[in-house]
From Swiss-Prot:
It comes from Mycobacterium tuberculosis (strain ATCC 25618 / H37Rv). This is NADH-quinone oxidoreductase subunit G. It comes from the Bacteria. The keyword rRNA-binding does not apply. It is an enzyme of class 7 (translocase). Binds 1 [2Fe-2S] cluster per subunit. Binds 3 [4Fe-4S] clusters per subunit. Pfam families: Fer2_4, Fer4_Nqo3, Molybdopterin, Molydop_binding, NADH-G_4Fe-4S_3. [4Fe-4S] cluster 1 binds at H111, C115, C118, C124. The gene is nuoG.
Amino acid sequence: MTQAADTDIRVGQPEMVTLTIDGVEISVPKGTLVIRAAELMGIQIPRFCDHPLLEPVGACRQCLVEVEGQRKPLASCTTVATDDMVVRTQLTSEIADKAQHGVMELLLINHPLDCPMCDKGGECPLQNQAMSNGRTDSRFTEAKRTFAKPINISAQVLLDRERCILCARCTRFSDQIAGDPFIDMQERGALQQVGIYADEPFESYFSGNTVQICPVGALTGTAYRFRARPFDLVSSPSVCEHCASGCAQRTDHRRGKVLRRLAGDDPEVNEEWNCDKGRWAFTYATQPDVITTPLIRDGGDPKGALVPTSWSHAMAVAAQGLAAARGRTGVLVGGRVTWEDAYAYAKFARITLGTNDIDFRARPHSAEEADFLAARIAGRHMAVSYADLESAPVVLLVGFEPEDESPIVFLRLRKAARRHRVPVYTIAPFATGGLHKMSGRLIKTVPGGEPAALDDLATGAVGDLLATPGAVIIVGERLATVPGGLSAAARLADTTGARLAWVPRRAGERGALEAGALPTLLPGGRPLADEVARAQVCAAWHIAELPAAAGRDADGILAAAADETLAALLVGGIEPADFADPDAVLAALDATGFVVSLELRHSTVTERADVVFPVAPTTQKAGAFVNWEGRYRTFEPALRGSTLQAGQSDHRVLDALADDMGVHLGVPTVEAAREELAALGIWDGKHAAGPHIAATGPTQPEAGEAILTGWRMLLDEGRLQDGEPYLAGTARTPVVRLSPDTAAEIGAADGEAVTVSTSRGSITLPCSVTDMPDRVVWLPLNSAGSTVHRQLRVTIGSIVKIGAGS
């Protein structure tokens, strides 16, 4: 009997080899490891060090098999299948079975009997394989080796060295996948052990993966340690809500409380990895300030205290206030909502409030960005995928730092560079640690000079690479703050034929774009200005007409609210601190006659609202996020039942509110929203050209001044990290970055305090002298001691003052 292995064939038919395993012939692609060939036949060879995404090392020797013609058993995880090879596993060979029993006995000699208290107990490969491939008793009578435990690898990862079997999974992940030197094998022989670098700071965003892939309980998570047993938990597949990567994950919970998250196995997206933020930042949904009941102003007094009320009463008050302001109402929806919720906001704005004043971009943005999204991104699903990054002849990044802003994109780019030699270029002020890990190349640029740099790339070596089929240009949301930046990126893509991808920072932004939560776009990427597009939406929504005039963007909505042009605001999940001037946002809310807020937790927005509706976190509702690729990532509620808080999905709240206003919204469930979106489909008409915005060029600062640049670090002061102190403990130290000449100009040395200031505030941090353009200053935008929007009231690209000292 002969079996043929299924193979992902990209180019042509791979060369095959045929071997025999346990008496059965199988044909596999040349280069396949014996252990993989056995897996294709359903034969499970025990192993510890082997992992399909790590390079083979043969460290544990547990996978020994007998190979005909060899003098001794071979490790199947390092042995490559060859033509006519005859392999016998433990199922048919006494030699292989005896060898595996011997290795297991050796591994257990010093392993402690911690199973009753070990976090890995119940899901431990060592425990399971000791039962299936080990002895029933031990012949070892000497004292076991012991170590002091645990050792803090970081604030959130603990190491029990005496449990370690030296499989090197964690160290290989550190070196091969993350590129972070945070854990290594130390000493030799009987003294060999896993340890950390004493002189290297722990700065990995991916350390939690070592806990998950550890085949024993040597590495454990601080937050989960001694909290539960695997067999006590209910596991639910879910999707990460923290960024646009779209990671699959598993949520483990008990009695209505989430206890841990693990990376899900999705080869097309995150493979088997996730970042530490996605793994551990979930306690925000159970903080004491979670809203559990609708709130209204006491006695209807706009200055009265917020008091609890019934859903029906809150609906009646909100409906009355919004109906009175119909046609003079704006909708602000943050980038964290699901695709279905964003669709409900977009539909509610148009048919219930009669306005196109809606925007999901609760952050610095521009009209150029809206044009770019309409022309190049909306309605174009999967134009670039994760797989495309691996096979691209070149990847160009602009306005985007993947390690901080989309960690799984970073891991895939690092894999592309390391395994496939894909060159990665970035247009940025300086080379980051992430760029070095991707073996990337810097195109050093002053903030504001990105359009000129992009235009220059059209000719030359990089332009030639971009003209190669499959080349990719990735732009981040920060490029929206550079006049002409997105226009130049689109122009370069048109000139070279490179594919264009947009990676926002938040999980819900791409879905909100596709749902039509923009002042110039309808669902499916339909241009509002197109009469046919409006007619299609009218037919789907069973209405006579839609408001045709382009609406205001988020900044315009807030400005109109501040001068009382708008009489009411409907706000869902925005953070004023994400805007360039948070004080202006709060002032606009204060000036608005009637504010309805849909929110998970109390905030500066709910403090100013007239009606507050509690909404559910992602663990308690169904929905979908659309990741940066345009891939739909659906999920069901992990937590169900009477123990949950009273929040509802945004779309359910809006559907009920529309009913109270005499309008049938038709989205009471996610299924109803998805059916409507599927019926609408993607716009197949003409997309707008552009954008075509002229670049203004970088501003020229004087002595003692600098152009501000920066981005948000992955681990920062974001509200979705609230309640997770261990994760906050590994956030990177905030610094001010200056060039050597600029630091010398203001009299600051490396490590000394530097103050960055505007007329409205200042930030003082240690100086990190960096190879970057002169009179440019870099700050983390939302880290401890450096919340730029709140403290300076400006955003990147602005001129700020710099000086030595506090």
